[in-house]
């Protein structure tokens, strides 16, 4: 019995000695966080349905903000990848699920009314206040640029319209949580375009690509290009989401492409 006990101890000791050992005394300089972007969404349905879809179906987000009190629910740990952005691209980087945090905001999106009119649904003040607090926390922890806080329609303009034209990007910019074009520069550039022929479609496509949008470079005003123009307008010109470039759209493209951003008053 004593010999069996000694043999057992020897086997146990040998197993411990042969276990994996990793030295963590050194750290490489060449590394960064998985999280490079935040992508904002609306759920296009009510809270209960949103919660079900984001927890029981093969779609998810890291956070869900409900619509009454602005309660923030964490559904996926930030170290894990959530399935929220889908087929996506920004500034040449694709499949942003792997490099982003997704935030879903409970909102019906839009309702199609008679004669083809679209009614967009507003966000509650409680939701926006909660979102601002959450974004400030995420931005600080991951040292994110305000340029990398995006809408789903920015990264997937051919498929998505969220968070929509009623989303308060300008207000987020006041909090340092989004970029906003220099309004004086936009006004000056608009005055120039008011007096001359507007740029052609190839120019528009080039500016959109410089900003970060995945857009065809065909010189043709095709359906994909119109959708990308609408995505840009929803973000920076929500009063004119038509897919048609007017003098203000052109001015905004110039100012945003050259990254002439300011904090709005």
Predicted regions, residues:
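Positively charged n-region of N-terminal signal peptides that target proteins for export
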Residues: 1-4
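C-terminal motif of bacterial Sec signal peptides marking the signal peptidase cleavage site
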Residues: 12-15
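Active-site-adjacent loop/helix surface patches within enzyme catalytic domains
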Residues: 20-145
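Acidic, His- and aromatic-enriched active-site or binding-groove loops in soluble protein domains
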Residues: 64-65, 165-189
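Second-shell loop/turn segments in exported
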Residues: 89-92, 115-126, 156-159, 190-197, ...
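Acidic/histidine-rich, metal-coordinating catalytic segments
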Residues: 144-159
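Short acidic, glycine/serine/threonine-rich helix-capping segments at coil-helix boundaries
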Residues: 193-256, 262-265
């Amino acid at each position: 019995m004593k010999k069996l006990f000694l043999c057992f101890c020897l086997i146990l000791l040998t197993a411990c000695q042969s276990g994996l050992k990793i030295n963590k005394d050194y750290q490489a300089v060449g590394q960064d966080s998985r999280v490079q972007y935040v992508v904002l969404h609306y759920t296009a349905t009510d809270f209960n349905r949103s919660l079900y879809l984001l927890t029981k179906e093969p779609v998810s987000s890291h956070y869900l903000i409900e619509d009454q009190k602005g309660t923030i629910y964490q559904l996926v740990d930030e170290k894990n990848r959530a399935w929220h952005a889908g087929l996506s691209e920004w500034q040449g980087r694709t499949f942003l699920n792997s490099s982003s945090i997704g935030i879903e905001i409970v909102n019906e999106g839009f309702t199609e009314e008679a004669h083809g009119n679209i009614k967009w649904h507003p966000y509650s003040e409680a939701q926006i206040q909660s979102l601002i607090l959450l974004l400030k926390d995420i931005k600080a922890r991951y040292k994110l640029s305000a340029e990398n806080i995006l809408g789903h329609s920015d990264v997937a303009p051919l498929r998505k319209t969220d968070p929509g034209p009623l989303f308060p990007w300008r207000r987020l910019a006041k909090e340092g949580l989004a970029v906003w074009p220099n309004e004086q520069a936009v006004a000056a550039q608009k005055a120039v375009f008011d007096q001359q022929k507007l740029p052609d479609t190839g120019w528009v496509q080039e500016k959109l690509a410089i900003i970060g949008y995945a857009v065809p470079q065909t010189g043709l005003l095709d359906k994909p290009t119109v959708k990308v123009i609408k995505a840009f307008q929803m973000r920076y010109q929500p009063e004119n989401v038509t897919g048609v470039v007017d003098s203000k759209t052109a001015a905004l493209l110039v100012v945003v492409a050259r990254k002439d951003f300011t904090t709005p008053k």
